[in-house]
């Protein structure tokens, strides 16, 4: 995931992204609603071959995938592990183990030896945790994590954490950006009230009794 993040004071190519340089918007809360709250900047979908000079215009293609090959691999691996275990394939030719091994090898992990993967190869629960972590890394910042942690019933009360990099000291300090307080019913989203009014047998999800969300008829 670190390949997708840029932190304050981190070196990217020939530039140092600093949170302490005056006269810029860089750094934690330097300018309201414009600066980073966490000390992180996202780099995943940025092209590194553009002219970064202020005021310059670069004509480069920017592609946003609708569905990715690796996304389908990960979905298959998760389902296969739940249905047939880490190495079962039900005659399809590929097991969860095979798929995750291919994904990790493509990322430069394991190659001829992958001890972590092998530790999970004989245990469904361990393989499930590995697959979840692979989804977290491979699909980060692509809109999957929000839904994944809810369908897995993960703890939603983890605080949002940030880092303050110290370039001179080669260290960083972690801090809490925001506390999160969720109730169990929040694993499910509310049904818009306008939809409930259309069908009397439709019951609002538990905990959202007084939800006043509406949908557009457009």
Where are these regions (language model features)?
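Positively charged, low-complexity/disordered segments
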Residues: 1-7, 217-218
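Acidic/polar-rich alpha-helix caps and helix-coil junctions
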Residues: 8-9, 13-216
């Amino acid at each position: 995931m670190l390949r997708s993040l840029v932190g304050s004071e981190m070196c990217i190519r020939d530039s140092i992204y600093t949170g302490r340089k005056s006269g810029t918007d860089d750094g934690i809360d330097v300018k309201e609603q414009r600066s980073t709250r966490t000390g992180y900047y996202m780099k995943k979908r940025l092209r590194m071959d553009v002219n970064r000079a202020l005021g310059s215009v670069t004509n480069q293609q920017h592609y946003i995938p609708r569905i990715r090959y690796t996304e389908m691999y990960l979905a298959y691996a998760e389902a296969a592990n739940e249905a047939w275990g880490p190495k079962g394939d039900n005659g399809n030719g590929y097991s969860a183990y095979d798929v995750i091994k291919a994904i990790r090898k493509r990322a430069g992990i394991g190659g001829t030896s992958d001890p972590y993967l092998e530790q999970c190869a004989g245990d469904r629960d361990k393989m499930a945790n590995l697959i979840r972590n692979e989804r977290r890394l491979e699909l980060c910042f692509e809109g999957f994590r929000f839904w994944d942690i809810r369908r897995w019933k993960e703890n939603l009360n983890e605080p949002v954490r940030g880092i303050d990099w110290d370039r001179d000291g080669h260290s960083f300090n972690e801090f809490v950006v925001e506390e999160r307080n969720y109730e169990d019913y929040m694993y499910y989203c509310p049904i818009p009230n306008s939809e409930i009014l259309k069908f009397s047998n439709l019951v609002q999800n538990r905990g959202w009794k007084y939800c006043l969300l509406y949908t557009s008829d457009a």
